[in-house]
Amino acid sequence: MKKRTAAMLICLAGAFATVAMADDQEFVGWMKKTGGTVGKLRKEVEAKANPDIAKDATTLVEIFKDVEGYFAKSHTDDAVAMAQAAQAVAKQLADAASSGDADAVANTMKGVMASCAGCHGAHREKLPEGGYKIK
């Protein structure tokens, strides 16, 4: 009976570790997609390509919803709030682009960048060998 219980606990621990690794890999994918999307947005804002800005800002809203869920699982409340704020500012960017308000687009893009910087400062740690890890 004790061997069976021990084996069951080992299997459960392995399953939880696998789920956590999968979540972390998903998170890295979201961050890479966010970086690429923000890079596109910078060029689109400069070119005043409002339909593209609206589309890519909406993509950010969806990514930040996933990020919110990721941090909610670990009860990292400040990161959840940051992800919610990032969703809101990305939605504002999409709305500004849809309305054709160039000044609002430029100002709101600064808000998107600030959202990224705030969360990275609080929850991203640079590794000595290169790359980053989630704090």
Range-by-range predicted roles:
Residues 1-4:
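Positively charged n-region of N-terminal signal peptides that target proteins for export
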Residues 21-56:
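Immediate post-signal-peptide N-terminus of mature secreted/exported proteins
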Residues 42-54, 87-112:
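Amphipathic, charged alpha-helical scaffolds that flank and support histidine-based chemistry
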Residues 63-82:
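Short, solvent-exposed, charged loop/turn and helix-capping segments
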Residues 100, 122-128:
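Inter-heme linker and motif-flanking segments adjacent to c-type heme-binding CXXCH motifs
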Residues 112-123:
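The canonical Cys-X-X-Cys-His
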Residues 130-135:
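Short cysteine/histidine-rich metal-coordination sites, predominantly Zn2+-binding motifs
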